Amino acid sequence: MHHKALLISLASTALALHGSSSHSHLGKRFTFPLPSSKGSVTFDAPKIISGNTTFDGGMKTYGRGVECTEGEGGDSDAVFWVENGGTLKNAIIGADQIEGVHCMGACTIENVWWEAVCEDALSLKEGSGPFTVIGGGAQGAEDKVIQHNSGGTVSIDGFTVYNFGKLYRSCGNCDEMFERHVTVSGVTAVQGSTLVGINSNYGDTATIKGDVCATDVDTICQEYEGNSSGEEPPETGSGPSSACKYSEPLPAC
């Protein structure tokens, strides 16, 4: 009886060790560092941040008082519109919204956190940038966190993204297509499908710095063949290339 119990104990220990080895990345539970909210504000319409002005949200939570869904919304469903040259900083976007933040020209998004991503967190709608994201983070995006519809350059620095589809996607089938460039630095990415997606046939590039960490992210840089006909763009390759500029492997977070 003692011998049988010993065998069972050894088998259980071996199984536990195997599970620990094969799923070691699950051993450290990631906690999304959402800041504490200092109050809540519900808008009846998008809050407009005029060009070349700064709105400091004071780390309050901002929403629209609607159910968070993946349905395609419009500009009128955004929480904030940031006009050309405007800055949104120190804000939490609540789960009671659909479209998050829309940049209607060059913008700076600094220390902005999304409690939940519904359609997209941040949509870059007009102009050629620069579009600058500094700090902040987002979680729970079934698809895209940052959607880039216009042209130009995007910088994403120090952002935290957790449980996501894509951190950044250059629109693959907009009516009007542009060349787009994104630089990703200091980003913490955990449990996602794709870090960045670009259309290399339009001259897009993604530069991913060595201080980016990724844990349980399936694809770091995915290339597509974009189009302006509305068709679903096919994947054309992934990994380091002349369009996807980075070195593998990225460090784990």
From Swiss-Prot:
GO BP term, example: cell wall organization
Please provide, alphabetically and separated by semicolons, the GO molecular function terms listed in this UniProt record: pectate lyase activity
The UniProt catalytic activity note for this protein reads: Eliminative cleavage of (1->4)-alpha-D-galacturonan to give oligosaccharides with 4-deoxy-alpha-D-galact-4-enuronosyl groups at their non-reducing ends
Asked if the keyword Transport belongs to this entry, the reply reads: no
Which residues get glycosylated? 52, 227
Record localization: Secreted
Question: How is the cofactor bound here?
Answer: Binds 1 Ca(2+) ion per subunit.
Question: Which Pfam families does the entry mention?
Answer: Pectate_lyase
Q: What does this protein do?
A: Pectinolytic enzyme consist of four classes of enzymes: pectin lyase, polygalacturonase, pectin methylesterase and rhamnogalacturonase. Among pectinolytic enzymes, pectin lyase is the most important in depolymerization of pectin, since it cleaves internal glycosidic bonds of highly methylated pectins. Favors pectate, the anion, over pectin, the methyl ester.
The record's similarity note reads: Belongs to the polysaccharide lyase 3 family.
Protein name, please? Probable pectate lyase D
Q: Which organism is it from?
A: Aspergillus terreus (strain NIH 2624 / FGSC A1156)
